[in-house]
């Protein structure tokens, strides 16, 4: 199967470079699957995992919003923050999840910020499960 080049870039530099048969990202409109020769597009990303599948194996990167730019031969994910599974501190993510849940239980809270923090923590914990995969 044909592959497409993939780059995940943050303000701190490249987090992932490789090629994949299928790239799946979470956009603000829902999940988007991308294969080689996809039509060009740019879409805002939601917090979620970016998945890269090649030869039946899947790699993931936790993405904290940004944009995806698709060209027929390359996918660029420009993220505010992104982490590979081995970079994620699962204990820190678990504590962030607990704090976000506590804030959401409070009456006087910026719900949008607390929900975003909760989603980031859940995404990081889910992606961390792919360490060594």
From Swiss-Prot:
Where is it found, in Gene Ontology cellular component terms? plasma membrane; proton-transporting ATP synthase complex
Segment Disordered: which positions? 81-110
Any single GO molecular-function term of the entry would be:
ATP binding
Where is the protein found, in the record's own terms? Cell membrane
List, alphabetically, the InterPro entries matched. Answer: ATP_F1_dsu/esu_C_sf, ATP_synth_F1_dsu/esu, ATP_synth_F1_dsu/esu_N, ATP_synth_F1_esu_C, ATPsynth_dsu/esu_N
- Keyword terms of this UniProt record: ATP synthesis, Cell membrane, CF(1), Hydrogen ion transport, Ion transport, Membrane, Transport
Predominant cellular place of this UniProt entry's protein = membrane
Q: Which Pfam family is an annotated match for this chain, by its short name?
A: ATP-synt_DE
> What topology does the record note for this protein and the membrane?
Peripheral membrane protein
Q: Where is the signal peptide?
A: none
Write out the similarity annotation: Belongs to the ATPase epsilon chain family.
Give the protein's function: Produces ATP from ADP in the presence of a proton gradient across the membrane.
Summarize the subunit comment: F-type ATPases have 2 components, CF(1) - the catalytic core - and CF(0) - the membrane proton channel. CF(1) has five subunits: alpha(3), beta(3), gamma(1), delta(1), epsilon(1). CF(0) has three main subunits: a, b and c.
Record's protein name: ATP synthase epsilon chain
Q: Which organism is it from?
A: Shouchella clausii (strain KSM-K16) (Alkalihalobacillus clausii)
């Amino acid at each position: 199967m044909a592959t497409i080049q993939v780059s995940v870039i943050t303000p701190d530099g490249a987090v992932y470079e490789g090629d994949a048969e299928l790239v799946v990202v979470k956009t603000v409109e829902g999940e988007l699957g991308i294969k080689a020769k996809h039509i060009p597009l740019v879409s805002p990303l939601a917090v979620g995992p970016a998945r890269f599948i090649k030869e039946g194996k899947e790699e993931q990167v936790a993405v904290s919003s940004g944009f995806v730019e698709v060209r027929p031969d390359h996918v660029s994910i420009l993220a505010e923050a992104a982490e590979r599974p081995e970079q994620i501190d699962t204990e820190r993510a678990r504590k962030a999840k607990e704090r976000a849940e506590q804030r959401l239980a409070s009456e006087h809270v910026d719900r949008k910020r607390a929900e975003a923090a909760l989603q980031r923590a859940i995404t990081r914990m889910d992606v961390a499960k792919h360490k060594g995969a």
